[in-house]
Amino acid sequence: MQGTKIRLLTGGLLMLATVGYVQAEALQPDPAWQQGTLANGFQWQVLATPQRPSDRIEVRLSVNIGSLSESTQQSGFSHFIPRLALTQNGGLPTMQARSLWQQSIDPKRPLPPAIVSYDYSLFNLSLPNNRNDLLKEALSWLASASGKMSITPEAVNHALQGEDMVATWPADTKEGWWRYRLKGSTMLGHDPAAALKQPVDIAQLKDYYHKWYTPDAMTLIVVGNVDSRSVAEQINKTFGGLKGKRETPVAVPTLSPLPTTPVSIMTDAVRQDKLSLMWDAPWQPIRDSVALQRYWRDDLAREALFWHVQQNLSKSNIKDIGLGFDCRVLYQRAQCAINIESPGERLNANLTTVARELAKVRDNGLPQDEFDALIAQKNLELQKLFATYARTDTYLLISQRMRSLQNQVVDIAPEQYQKLRQEFLNSLTVDMLNQYLRQQLSQDMALVLQQPQGEPEYNMKDLQATREKLMAPAPAAAAASNSAGDVAQGRSEATDIPPAQ
């Protein structure tokens, strides 16, 4: 959910000049999604996909609790509770429960049956299509795990002796870059992969489970070729009897702003040097048309910048360089990067090439012909919107829905998307994109180098000097950039929500 990559870069502080005067239109949730809240606070959302009859039925149960709410004595509880649940039958006969889980993993896209992070615990099931009996069993098992689990010394010992099938997000919580990013955050002392303290305090574990696993902190999502009304009735029958209510607010994870100090990090996550020029800004929810258009404008500018730089590198026949842009939303911060993958001996030279191209775009803007080609491409994509939506499978639909909920983005119907998107493309100009890029490329960037373990540490001062030499803005440009930033501070954003929802 968190940290999902998005296509390109981040930003956007141009509201007064572009869409600040536009009347904001509230985004209307897609009515295809049926949703409700039971009397005990349990929330559910169902999307029937008759256009995808052969797809698997995707089921997710998210519980709003993770390792961040653990005390020192409770370390490892949030990870262990799903592990314990996965060893129990959930009210089903033993062979029936075993068969359910054997069929609940998509062989093409296998997911761990449960994932635990700092602020959520998630159960994943992917069921064969046209198996309403399995869906009924899955809901029954989830309801049992959500409030009726057996927590005894025997059950705990049995779970500890078995395989731990619970994954964490991120997958490696001790990876060097991630630990660096957590500096200054309370998350640093609350590892979702932490081992359970021995001996286990059964009474304390039971209290933790009943305190946090309450129906008003749960959301069930089902996507597939199902009868929405029938599933809604089954949800009410299965989950309506869960007891409990949150009395203590859950801890909210936060990240500090990304430091702009150059840093080199040794990590097993890369096989060759990876240098990132990074931006970091608060993430803003997308609930109205102005926020959506602002994101679209920024997104197109990022895409245009990427292809402009990529094409110029290709024309120059630059070798031994891999260029990528990515962006992700991490705990309400939009973190984006221009990534340069390169052998160590070519790193400074390749940074020189990329920085020079970025400086040219900042100072001169993108040419009109590249802008026109981009708009033509986006208009063509828009014409294929409904065909694209029909090809979007249930796995992608549910993944997108969960990111929308995580990042406070309103999912809209394809019809509203088409209308707003066409209005946006018709009103956009190359000057709007260039003003955004000028501001974005004039601000301070973090310089982060990830190196494979065992390599000699690179001198970051050399890379910093190269970047500053090539990308230092002229005084007039710097003043204009600072002024724009002061006017619209905090409006920078990015999203990992694909557009065709």
Region locations from a protein language model:
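An aromatic/glycine/proline-enriched structural segment found at the starts
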Residues: 219-276, 280-284, 454-488
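M16/MPP (pitrilysin/insulinase) zinc-metallopeptidase core fold and M16-derived inactive scaffolds
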Residues: 58-126, 172, 187-191, 303-332
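Non-catalytic, conformational "gating/processing" segments within enzyme and secreted inhibitor domains
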Residues: 202-237, 442-446
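Gram-negative bacterial Sec-dependent N-terminal signal peptides
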Residues: 1-23
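C-terminal regions of mature proteins
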Residues: 25-26, 219-224, 375-501
